Amino acid sequence: MVEILDRTYGAQFPEELECHLDLQNASANCCKFNRWGSIVAVGCTDGRVLIYDFMTRNIARTFSAHCLPVSCLSWSRDGRKLLTSSADNSIAMFDVLAGTLLHRIRFNSMVTFAMFHPRNDNKAIVLQVNKQPTVEQFSPRIQTVLANDTPGSSDESASCVSYDRKGKYIIAGTGKGKLLIYNAETLKCVAWCKQNTVQQIRQIIVPMKSRFIITNTQDRVIRTYELEDLLHQRGQMVEAKYKVLDMVNKAAWKNVCTDSDGLYVCGASTKAHSLYIWESNTGSLIKILHGNKGEALLDVQWHPTRPIILSIAQGTVSMWTQAHVENWSAFAPEFQELEENEKYIEKENEFDMEDEDADEDMTSKSQDAEDDIIDVVNVRPEDYLASSDEEDCNIMKPARNLESGPLWYIPVPLDIENADNDQRLPDDIRNLDNLLNPAWVASAKGYELSPKSK
């Protein structure tokens, strides 16, 4: 059945390199899609943040966010705010549409991770080097430290952290392979468990439409757990529901991403510019994407709704997409390719408005369909863009003036070329002295030029 769907609709994972984003002499360090994949933010090593319109691949905004490399990016739920963290020990929040800085918070050590609350852009979780994660409230300013008060783990610091998809829980991983789950409201630890390894958990990934969480561990194994199973644990060792790893090269993973449904998992190798794609439920390796040799991967992100992956290596953002092959016979089985031009002979009644041989039932149905009223004024939200936990798809409808609601795209003003050269010549010839030949102007006015002036 899967093979039939793949032949009909195509594989839902990237297959080849399509292009590179134009960074305008910048060196990329990390990237992040907004919730719908219409805008992508790219953090650079010089502290700048470039905002791209993903449809046109052009830069819509540029923020001078930090003075050192940007380490992490996070979008708010409505796409109007962008949170950045940097090696300069600070995080910053920007209004994407206005291009203004809203908040900046400085810390005592380098910030490696920052993430908006999935449902509240006034809160964010921040992780510093060798410190416990903190929950930051921007207005009013409140900071709360997530303490590790589990038995026998007082000296363990968190190595990674993330919200679940609804923002009800905070999931933290430690340097000894433990998973801690906090209530996002009370900030109390409600569950903790151990992986079957004591290696450091480097990353926690939560798919947008899945009840699973994925961990990237130092032992080079990518594990998938069901969140509901972890909520009932009190220090027990938990076996992963699915595991994927590189059986041949034993590669370690710099970064891991997944599609919105959690059906595919992509691992970015630390040794080379290679992307490994597995089926998460079977663990079978289905594709390896190879970039240029000698490049080291820094980040990888999967598009929220399309089979597109962005990878960053050596400061360059590469876009991997599907291999599109034209197959017209899939749309019209009777389609035939011609070796040379032929004159087409029209069949009788082929292009008539009414088919005399058609059934009466079909004619009545077509007439009823023509009488249907089509709404061309109101915007109808698409369900496939919403995650599985959406309460109401109408919250995805932006306002017509873009002052409220989700920000799907950034409007760009028209750039009229040679606007200054559109000059109208005045009727009075006295105003043309600067534009015309002086001799011609003097002759038109009835003056005679001396030989020296010629």
From Swiss-Prot:
WD repeats lie at residues 23-64, 65-104, 153-192, 196-235, 248-288, 292-330. Gene3D superfamilies: YVTN repeat-like/Quinoprotein amine dehydrogenase. The keyword Transcription regulation applies. One of its GO terms (cellular component) is Set1C/COMPASS complex. Disruption phenotype: Strongly reduced di- and trimethylation at 'Lys-4' of histone H3 in embryos and adult germline stem cells. Mutants also display defects in egg laying and fertility with defective germ cell development. RNAi-mediated knockdown disrupts development of the ASE left (ASEL) neuron, causing it to adopt the ASE right (ASER) cell fate. It is found in: Nucleus. GO terms for biological process: egg-laying behavior; germ cell development; heterochromatin organization; programmed cell death; transdifferentiation. Keywords: Chromatin regulator, Nucleus, Repeat, Transcription, Transcription regulation, WD repeat. Required for di- and trimethylation at 'Lys-4' of histone H3. Regulates left/right asymmetry of ASE sensory neurons, via its role as a component of the SET2 complex. This is Retinoblastoma-binding protein homolog 5. It comes from Caenorhabditis elegans.
